[in-house]
């Protein structure tokens, strides 16, 4: 459109249909870059490229050996806490743990142990007494006076009576020039003057279970 025609159209001297405004023409702008209507192809994506949160999860095949569900209780049996039976707390015999207490170099040769109790050996007539109360002190004194080595097992006595009997035996050994030795807890050996029992023999007798030879 020429400039003259535009002036005529502005003052009403030319029909308005012939007036074309480049700023209102949506078909194609006359200058500048074309205005995209929707998109120019960049950033375009398909709906399939993104996961739909409402979509069901993929049904993957189960691992080999898996059968699903829970194990049948009848197949494996009901599982219950293991019940432990409390062992009977019986009082062990003194000789039983002594027989198993020594191993290796400290253990005495069984042949040497047997020789200690052969006829004619001082320990062959040794005796073991297990008094229940102090009234049995007389028996201990008579055996010791006759030249018999005596083992006093005071385990079954209460502490008060055991202490009295220990004092009695110590005085008895002193009066008759014997010896009085402790071989284990609440177990003592009274040896007459003519019976020589070395400390090593006393220890090994106790550790290897002297009570098996009484």
Swiss-Prot record:
Per its UniProt record, what InterPro entries does this chain match?
A: Cell_div_SepF, Cell_div_SepF/SepF-rel, SepF-like_sf
Keyword set for this entry? Answer: Cell cycle, Cell division, Cytoplasm, Septation
One cellular component term (GO) for this entry is:
cytoplasm
Task: Give an example GO biological process.
Answer: FtsZ-dependent cytokinesis
Show the ranges annotated as biased composition (Basic and acidic residues): 36-58
Q: What Gene3D superfamilies does UniProt report for this protein, alphabetically?
A: SepF-like protein
- Region of interest called Disordered, as start-end residue ranges on this chain: 23-70
Where in the cell?
Cytoplasm
Q: What is its main location?
A: cytoplasm
The similarity annotation says:
Belongs to the SepF family.
Recorded hits in HAMAP family, A to Z, give: SepF
Could you describe the subunit structure of this protein? Homodimer. Interacts with FtsZ.
* Alphabetized PANTHER family for the sequence: CELL DIVISION PROTEIN SEPF (PTHR35798:SF1)
The entry's function note states: Cell division protein that is part of the divisome complex and is recruited early to the Z-ring. Probably stimulates Z-ring formation, perhaps through the cross-linking of FtsZ protofilaments. Its function overlaps with FtsA.
Protein name per Swiss-Prot or TrEMBL? Cell division protein SepF
Q: Which gene encodes it?
A: sepF
């Amino acid at each position: 459109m020429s400039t003259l025609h535009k002036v005529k159209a502005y003052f009403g001297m030319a029909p308005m249909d012939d007036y074309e405004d480049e700023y209102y023409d949506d078909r194609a702008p006359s200058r500048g870059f074309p205005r995209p209507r929707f998109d120019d192809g960049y950033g375009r994506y398909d709906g399939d490229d993104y996961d739909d949160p409402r979509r069901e999860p993929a049904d993957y095949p189960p691992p080999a050996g898996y059968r699903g569900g829970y194990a049948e209780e009848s197949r494996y049996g009901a599982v219950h806490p293991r019940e432990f039976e409390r062992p009977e707390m019986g009082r062990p015999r003194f000789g039983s743990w002594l027989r198993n207490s020594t191993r290796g170099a400290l253990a005495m040769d069984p042949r040497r142990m047997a020789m200690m109790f052969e006829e004619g050996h001082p320990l062959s007539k040794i005796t073991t007494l297990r008094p229940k109360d102090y009234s049995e002190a007389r028996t201990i004194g008579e055996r010791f006076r006759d030249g018999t080595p005596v083992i006093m097992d005071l385990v079954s006595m209460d502490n008060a009576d055991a202490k009295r009997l220990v004092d009695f035996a110590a005085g008895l050994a002193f009066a008759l020039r014997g010896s009085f030795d402790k071989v284990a807890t609440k177990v003592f050996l009274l040896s007459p003057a003519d019976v020589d029992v070395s400390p090593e023999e006393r220890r090994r007798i106790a550790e290897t279970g002297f009570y098996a030879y009484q």
